[in-house]
């Protein structure tokens, strides 16, 4: 949630969930699943990392980025982390 809060502060991010994706070297790679404010010009991974660098420790910075049309949430607004993890894993495999 800390990483999500920082990434929400980027002007190009409308909504975001952050999940761990299995990675050979790191065990798990922090991956941001982002719905951009402007789908025609989504933020890049480098932009998000630069934005978050002042507020987060290096190991918390996203190592992956998946752009989606909409971040899936329940009718009550709860994050669907299973969907986000599946989406991120499918995009990085």
Region roles according to the model:
Residues 85-93:
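Acidic/polar alpha-helix N-cap and adjacent early helical turns
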Residues 1-60, 72-75, 85-86:
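AMP-binding/adenylate-forming catalytic core of the ANL superfamily
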Residues 18, 66-67:
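Hydrophobic/anchoring residues in structured secondary elements
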Residues 62-64:
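Residue-level recognition of the N-termini of beta-strands and the immediately preceding loop/turn
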